[in-house]
Design a protein with these regions (language model features):
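C-terminal tail/sorting-segment detector
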Residues: 351-374
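Short strand-edge motifs at loop-to-beta-strand transitions and within beta-strands
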Residues: 340-344
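Surface-exposed loops/turns
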Residues: 309, 350-351
């Protein structure tokens, strides 16, 4: 069976979960991006224009028409990039994050800092902020990709893209040139990979964008905080209705309610999707603050270990039953809660990806992807 068919089976397994909760918004297509922008990796406003750039090759900034996605201007900067995934800014500087690390092998992660005034004068000179993660290990390296960061008054705040854990950890480094060890601040249960960030300290608001392992997009909202205390307010994860294949990469806004996103060209797993400029209206989610969860920095229950060599554990409280499916949609086994910690024995299964449909005591269902890897 083709990989795309497998993905559709998994989505059918998870469909009861996806249908629950507040009505999900849709990111509307403004237009396809030109071929020059197929590797779009970021999005930001500067001097009244919406800008993006690609994640590799020459460092060129492209201004996009917000009504069509067409290129209206460009700025060629000196040098080249390896995997530039985000551009952020403060009042004085632009920060270019060459910190993408899909395979967890880079030892040259860095941020290029450029004075905004240099764009007008043409005297382009970058400072470099080198950094590393002190808690990165060989086995966890793929959880230390990073495609989103923001600049506060005192530091750069990085949000990791976790290929293994499907969450994000937040780190900080100083805003000045040098060599730094990133300091871990907190973890976020994004249930997907974070790829972009839009920080609005004057509104006490931060919005992350990303997608899950099926390239289904989501945004993660922080709202109601003061200063740089990002976790001092409310948080909410919002899934979009766009479906499979939307590899969202950048996010930007001018009013804090209506957002622009870009999605990168995708041609993998039997899925082809063009690079596009999108719009997303989040007005209802910031108005209905009573529906925003307070500090959901961990899931309601934890499945561990994942990946596993055979046995995974779930707490008994809140869980009624668990069904195990393969990615073709075939049910493999059922487990019932016997008022003790649930142990799901997968030792008889071959190495691969499986889906758990978890039935909770309140009747709701949720899905979790587990990986058997020996």
């Amino acid at each position: 069976m083709k990989r795309s068919s497998m993905i559709l089976w998994v989505l059918l397994i998870l469909s009861p979960v996806l249908a629950q909760g507040q009505e999900r918004p849709t990111a509307e297509v403004v237009g396809d991006l030109p071929t020059e922008m197929e590797g779009t990796s970021t999005l930001f406003f500067l001097d009244g224009k919406l800008w993006s750039c690609n994640d590799h090759g020459s460092l060129v900034l492209y201004a996009l028409d917000t009504l069509s996605g067409n290129i209206t201007d460009s700025i060629v900067l000196p040098g080249s990039i390896y995997d530039l995934e985000e551009v952020t800014q403060d009042d004085e500087y632009l920060y270019f994050g060459d910190m993408g690390d899909n395979n967890g092998v880079r030892n040259d992660l860095h941020v290029l800092r450029l004075e905004k005034a240099a764009l007008a004068s043409g005297a382009i000179a970058f400072d470099t902020l080198w950094f590393s993660y002190p808690d990165r290990t060989d086995s966890s390296a793929r959880d230390f990709d990073c495609e989103a960061f923001v600049a506060t008054d005192t530091a750069l705040i990085l949000f990791t893209k976790q290929w293994l854990s499907q969450g994000s950890s937040c780190y900080s480094i100083p805003k000045t040139p040098g060599r730094w060890e990133a300091r871990r601040l907190f973890d976020i249960a994004t249930e997907g990979m974070v790829t972009g960030a839009c920080y609005q300290p004057e509104r006490g608001r931060l919005v992350l964008c990303g997608y899950n392992m099926f390239c289904m997009p989501f945004v993660y909202l922080f709202d109601g905080f003061s200063g740089s205390d990002i976790v001092g307010g409310r948080q909410q994860r919002v899934e979009l209705t766009n479906g499979v294949g939307w590899q969202t990469e950048g996010i930007a806004t001018t009013d804090g309610l209506h957002y622009y996103l870009t999605c990168e060209h995708l041609d993998a797993y039997g899925i082809t999707h063009p690079a596009q400029l999108l719009t997303l209206d989040l007005t209802a989610f910031f108005s209905s603050t009573s529906q925003i969860l307070s500090h959901p920095t961990s899931r309601s229950f934890t499945i561990y270990p994942n990946p596993t060599i055979g046995i995974i554990h779930l707490p008994s409280q809140g869980v009624k039953a668990v069904a195990v499916f393969d990615v073709q949609g075939h049910k493999i086994s059922d487990f019932r809660n016997q008022n003790s910690e649930l142990k799901i024995d997968l030792r008889s299964l071959p190495i691969g990806t499986y889906v758990l449909r978890i039935t909770c005591e309140d009747g709701q269902e949720r899905g979790e992807v587990v990986i058997v890897n020996r």
